[in-house]
């Protein structure tokens, strides 16, 4: 390894690290927020909430990330807004939408892993469904979700390199 060459280009490496971290953190935060709602939607008994959530997750988990980036940057955003956004904005949107699908499955599985008796106990104490979810079910579920959410962050960090194809 020629360390002088690495040292000469250190500013470019630092800029690349900063862009990677920015894409990953923005994509992850948006993906967690949107994924929570999608995960709850997948558990809804209302079909008009359940089916769009289910289809969204299946489509985004079933298509390659690179294809999603191209469609969002070259087709979806220009057709909706009339112009293309920069590569960073398009990349963050693509990462958020993809990460949300995976996070939705993590949230759904985490919530369903909590024994049903917990909800029954909370309801018997007079809590509403929303209160029981917020105060009893979700705290227990989050403990089980931490490892897969960490794995999703690492996967998103790796996927952020695919944004390069629209940045170049």
What are these regions (language model features)?
Residues 1-168:
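Transmembrane alpha-helices and adjacent helix-loop boundaries
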